[in-house]
């Protein structure tokens, strides 16, 4: 469906309406910081890389030399949590096959839970019936040690629909761990506290890497080579991330947001963190940069159409995006022109960077942006007509696209290497069930934390308000029930990811990685809009190296 056709020969009905009052977002917390950030000298970095390479081979030999299933499971989970696993994909895949073909369904709940967690996380469809062995004659879970409870708790969050035993395991372990928490000592106390806040499976990989290093350092069973390698790897990744932040900040500064688009959230560092959480391994540098630029554009579009432009200007912008041509700039009010031209210029640069063999991917990216803006215009119509969709299903027909989930996934795959094919790009754009479940999860998570804030201004009705009207609930009641729907979305995403066998594992893995970043950014507050809440975390991730 094309955007409404406009002309430039004067105002039409609605053009003279007063410009909306934009909400006041706090200014950037970072400014030019990463433009002048001083990295270690080349000699220092070379020394770090040389030592890291020695340690990398030591750890590789540990993996190859591991034979017992308990040893293999513990080692791989440790490497995953420290973000070292990407160094050893082939070796780990060989060991996963050993673990999968083993028969561990008996007495050791800790091992059974960790084996289940590891295999399901890595795409193996293992049965949850194994946990029935740990119930008594009345169907209740048997009380066990805290470490086993924690392992069961983390395993249970990889549940899919119909796995009642895992639903029950979450209720049981949550209650037990909460009761025991105040009596625990370090380091398991920190582990339990972190898990109760965010189960292991749902944690953002870069944050888990940062947070787990000090916990692993306190572990009596820690391996000194693994620990040293984890610290060096973190610091080397920090150098890479900081250089990418410098590139993204330079690109963002050229748009002169503070003068041309002062009503927009100036959050380029926060965007980078959010998007890099979905593909944080070093080989995905191009994806991270493309993602950061795309979501910066989404932010501009969202803040312009939702909070600043009047309805006529919004339709002008929608028409220009639909045309995707420099000549369409004549449609736009003055304050939109530079942004629009920069949008076209940036997409042209994507095509040049990808080269003749991969530039076809940018076509899908353009189509995803156009689709996003089309759905924005439908929401603007809802807002202007004070229309409330009758059901959540009706709302989601529009809003699961307008939240940008499809565009984010498309952006991630555009920048990846040869593993991404035309078939994968078409799958992302085809309304696939996994993509749809992800979009619903993003939309509901966003609306739970943003609805109350947005009531201060006239906004399109959210899924929360729609659900309130549909089921005659208060806002708090609706939010609680929608939280249950987000849990349902997790089950769908895991289920659909396990079933997606015709594509490389990186496809479902990327979707789930982005779900983790969404979960973090919208847990309890909108950390993107109110980014003071994550300033210290970002400093520890991108500025302060880990002490060796």
Curated annotation (Swiss-Prot):
Keywords assigned by UniProt, alphabetized: Cytoplasm, Isomerase, Lyase, Magnesium, Manganese, Metal-binding, Plant defense
Binding site for Mg(2+) 2: 302, 306
Binding site for Mg(2+) 3: 446, 450, 454
Enzyme Commission number: 5.5.1.17, 4.2.3.113, 4.2.3.55, 4.2.3.15
Induction notes from the record: Up-regulated by herbivory and fungi (e.g. Fusarium spp., C.heterostrophus, F.verticillioides, R.microsporus and A.parasiticus).
Cofactor requirements of the protein: Mg(2+); Mn(2+)
Binding site for substrate: 302, 306, 443, 446
Superkingdom, taxonomy of origin: Eukaryota
Pathway: Secondary metabolite biosynthesis; terpenoid biosynthesis
UniProt KW Oxidoreductase keyword: no
Biological processes, Gene Ontology terms: defense response to fungus; diterpenoid biosynthetic process; terpenoid biosynthetic process
Quaternary assembly: Monomer.
Miscellaneous note of the record: Tyr-522 is involved in the initial isomerization of the (E,E)-nerolidyl cation to its (Z,E)-isomer.
Similarity-based family: Belongs to the terpene synthase family.
Name the UniProt record assigns to this protein: (S)-beta-macrocarpene synthase
Species, as recorded: Zea mays
Gene behind this protein: TPS11
């Amino acid at each position: 469906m094309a955007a409404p056709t406009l002309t430039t020969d004067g105002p039409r009905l609605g053009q003279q309406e007063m410009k909306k009052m934009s909400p006041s977002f706090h200014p950037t917390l970072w400014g030019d910081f990463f433009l002048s950030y001083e990295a270690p000298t080349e000699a220092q970095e070379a020394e770090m890389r040389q030592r890291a390479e020695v340690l990398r081979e030591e750890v590789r030999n540990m993996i190859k030399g591991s034979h017992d299933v308990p040893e293999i499971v513990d080692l791989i989970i440790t490497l995953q949590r420290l973000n070292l696993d990407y160094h050893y994909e082939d070796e780990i895949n060989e060991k996963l096959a050993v673990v999968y073909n083993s028969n561990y369904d008996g007495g050791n709940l800790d091992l059974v839970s960790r084996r289940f967690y590891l295999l399901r996380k890595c795409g193996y469809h293992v049965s949850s019936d194994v946990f029935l062995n740990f119930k008594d004659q009345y169907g209740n879970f048997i009380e066990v040690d805290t470490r086993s409870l924690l392992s069961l708790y983390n395993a249970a969050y990889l549940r899919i629909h119909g796995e009642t035993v895992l639903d029950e395991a979450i209720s049981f372990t949550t209650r037990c761990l909460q009761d025991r928490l105040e009596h625990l000592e370090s380091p398991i106390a920190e582990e339990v506290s972190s898990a109760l806040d965010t189960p292991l499976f749902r944690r953002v990989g870069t944050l888990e890497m940062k947070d787990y290093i000090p916990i692993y350092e306190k572990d009596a069973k820690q391996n000194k080579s693994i620990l040293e390698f984890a610290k060096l790897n973190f610091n080397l990744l920090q150098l890479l991330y900081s250089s990418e932040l410098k590139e993204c900040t330079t690109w963002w500064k050229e748009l002169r947001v503070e003068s041309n688009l002062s009503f927009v959230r100036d959050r380029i560092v926060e965007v980078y963190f959010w998007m890099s959480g979905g593909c944080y391994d070093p080989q995905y540098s191009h994806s991270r940069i493309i993602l950061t630029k795309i979501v910066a554009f989404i932010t501009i579009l969202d803040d312009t159409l939702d909070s600043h432009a009047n309805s006529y200007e919004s339709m002008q912008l929608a028409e220009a995006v639909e045309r995707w041509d420099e000549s369409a700039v004549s449609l736009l009010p003055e304050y939109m022109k530079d942004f629009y031209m920069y949008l076209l210029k940036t997409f042209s640069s994507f095509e040049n960077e990808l080269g003749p063999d991969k530039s076809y991917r940018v076509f899908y990216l353009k189509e995803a942006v156009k689709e996003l803006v089309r759905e924005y215009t439908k929401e603007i119509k809802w807002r202007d007509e004070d229309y409330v969709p009758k059901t959540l299903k009706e709302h989601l027909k529009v809003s699961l696209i307008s939240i940008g989930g499809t565009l984010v996934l498309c952006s991630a795959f555009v920048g990846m290497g040869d593993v991404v094919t035309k078939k994968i790009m078409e799958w992302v754009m085809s309304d696939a069930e996994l993509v749809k479940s992800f979009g619903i999860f993003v939309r509901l998570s966003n609306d739970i934390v943003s609805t109350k804030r947005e009531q201060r201004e006239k906004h399109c009705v959210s899924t929360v308000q729609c659900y309130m009207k549909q089921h005659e609930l208060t806002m708090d009641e609706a939010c609680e029930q929608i939280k249950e729907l987000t849990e349902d979305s997790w089950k769908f995403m895991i289920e659909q990811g396990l079933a997606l066998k015709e594509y490389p594992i990186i496809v479902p893995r990327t979707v789930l990685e982005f779900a983790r970043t969404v979960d973090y950014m919208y847990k309890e507050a909108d950390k993107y809009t109110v980014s003071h809440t994550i300033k210290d975390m970002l400093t520890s991730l991108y500025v302060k190296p880990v002490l060796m």
